[in-house]
Amino acid sequence: MSKVAAVLKVMPDSPDIDLDGLEADLSESLPDGAEINGTDTEEVAFGLTALLTTVIVPDDSGGTEAVEDAFGAVDDVESVSVEEVGRL
């Protein structure tokens, strides 16, 4: 079974959000079969920092939609967008 790597940009709803705590919450929200392979940050504007989270999901699981939905349901997340996708 092949896997897909995707970089998801997670925007917190405030610049005051603890990014380490948010990263832990994202990790806990992952659907079965998905795993976080790394996280980086990106300064956006006005003190707001986005998390760039690399997620590995099985290719047969319908892509990144389940992960996007799970991340979007986490408290303090304003939005989730797919930045990059590629097969492993």
UniProtKB/Swiss-Prot annotation:
Entry keyword annotation includes Protein biosynthesis: yes
Tree of life domain: Archaea
MF terms (GO), sorted A to Z: translation elongation factor activity
Keyword tRNA processing: no
Keywords on record: Elongation factor, Protein biosynthesis
Annotated InterPro entries: eEF-1beta-like_sf (IPR036219), EF1B_bsu/dsu_GNE (IPR014038), Transl_elong_EF1B/ribsomal_bS6 (IPR014717), Transl_elong_EF1B_B_arc (IPR004542)
SUPFAM superfamilies with a match to the protein in the record: eEF-1beta-like
Protein family (similarity comment): Belongs to the EF-1-beta/EF-1-delta family.
Role of this protein: Promotes the exchange of GDP for GTP in EF-1-alpha/GDP, thus allowing the regeneration of EF-1-alpha/GTP that could then be used to form the ternary complex EF-1-alpha/GTP/AAtRNA.
The protein's name: Elongation factor 1-beta
Species name: Halobacterium salinarum (strain ATCC 700922 / JCM 11081 / NRC-1)
Gene for this chain: ef1b
